[in-house]
């Protein structure tokens, strides 16, 4: 007798349910509560694709705390042109549950979403600039720069490393190694200069009294944001050509 692992049991149960739903002609809404366990590394992508396929002709609601699975859902939904309504249920700062936000949390957002958020936040900083004290302005620009720095890091992982090595299965995709061959020295210099600049702006370490630090102006911030967006477009192009 063979005993199924927890992940295999979850996958088998989900497969049975999806088969049953497939033959249901009512097209009623389907709700999944954390359909993938942490053990289902090799099945996440297949399950996400099947759930998205189901969502093409009925409402599908998915509750999950698995960010990798969420990423797979979004990826397959984009491929299939299936619209997504983003919502996050979380606790407030006093640990009371039930706060609902009409977007994914920052750590779950992809590079494109983060870039859009950073552009909106920069517009607010520009608008408030003249009414802020030096310290208040430095705090706002430091937080913004920290998130831009994180977006660079996310881009390197998601658009370079994870395209070559599947993080859920650790499978290496040899053909996509071509992405690395297309990255030029200019690309590296662009990344290094921008990442170094925004890391300096971010409040990660105490600024020495001997170092006369001046927070970046909005034009400098916009330049670095545009540099990231252009780098992202180039690296996506490399991936599409591989």
Residue ranges and their predicted role:
Residues 26-34:
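Catalytic Walker B motif of ABC-type/P-loop ATPase nucleotide-binding domains
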Residues 46-159, 169-187, 191, 222-229, ...:
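C-terminal lobe/lid and adjacent interdomain/linker elements of RecA-like ASCE P-loop ATPase modules
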Residues 181-210:
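C-terminal intrinsically disordered, low-complexity extensions immediately downstream
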Residues 201-242:
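Charge-enriched, short contiguous segments at helix-coil
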